[in-house]
Amino acid sequence: MKVGVPSEVKNHEDRVALTPSGVHELVRAGHQVFVETRAGVGSAILDEDFVAAGATILGTADEVWDTADLVLKVKEPIAEEYHRMRKGQVLFTYLHLAASRPCTDALLESGITSIAYETVQLPDGSLPLLAPMSEVAGRMAPQVGAHHLQSDGGGRGVLMGGVSGVYAAKVVVLGAGVSGMSAAAIALGMQAEVLLVDKNIARLRSADAIYQGHLQTVASNAYEIERAVIDADLVIGAVLVPGAKAPMLVSNQLVSQMKPGSVLVDIAIDQGGCFEDSHPTTHADPTYRVHNSLFYCVANMPGAVPHTSTYALTNVTLPYVLEIANLGWRDALRADPALALGLNTQEGILTCPPVGESLGLPSVTPSEVLN
């Protein structure tokens, strides 16, 4: 199979979808790999590294897309890439379609077969291809929150860990999944006062056991969220419904009651965000104000640490890439139920019901297409 790796074009997105070791494994299995020139530079991977592993370097994104049977990306296609997609081609990347009707429409109109990293789901409900980027974003959230709590970052001038005789920052983490637990761990490491909120009591019990009382936990409901958010210096939104739009947990009216200079970091922005006033921002212009609070809603947070993120991502995606390349997408999905759940579109058909529900579009299950 011909596997193509174009450069990412989203603002400040320096990750790349394949490393030289991945190229080596694909070539060893009998496949051809085509990489756009300089695609790996942001992740400190040079063209020469790809060539040494067996890849062919192409000069433009158009050449890569035209050549490839299987296109590997990190982020969803944006408008300038839509014309490159075609029927008979397979795209394997993060899609987050519940938050993007234009991208969904473009995929359906092109007829491309698209498989989303974030909806590949194991029998235990875990999301193996989303987990590493959730971990990165979760670990970054307290860092960016701490910066923006500083007065030079636009915040109320609070130090996360406080000092002797002065209160530490109050951090509320909404969601105790991979990103939420990662955020809580880093915030605790910064010596903040941390409250973890989730509706899953088993997860909260696990957090209590891990951190032995060093953080507080509370069951999620509207009353407790309101109390926590009003008292918070930093709120980190880390909720997820696989494939679907994130639930809205913090209203505009609630933000109006927050402390002046408080900060909200929405990790869930890829799936539409969990704050009413959230809208996607970029690393170049990451924040905006609502009432007297500062919102940080960068949709590709891990893109700011591309070296770490690229290797963390490709560690988990490569086995699935090899399955698709070795068997062809249809047989690979038939053989692997977890991978089958990643199928989002196929020749103009939406195959992810949670996306259909979020966007009001007709959909079928992956099994209906595969069978």
Label the model's feature ranges.
Residues 118-159, 269, 274-371:
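Adenosine-phosphate binding glycine-rich loop
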Residues 209-291:
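Rossmann-like adenosine-cofactor binding region
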Residues 69, 75-76, 95-96, 221, ...:
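Short glycine-/small-residue-rich Rossmann-like dinucleotide-binding loops
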Residues 2, 8, 79-169, 298-300:
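Glycine/serine-rich phosphate-binding loop and adjoining beta1-alpha1 elements at the start
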Residues 2-110:
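An N-terminal-biased, well-structured beta-alpha scaffold segment characteristic
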Residues 6-45, 152-237, 287:
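Glycine-rich phosphate/diphosphate-binding loop of Rossmann-like nucleotide-binding domains
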Residues 76, 136, 177-178:
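Residue-level detector of alpha-helix initiation sites
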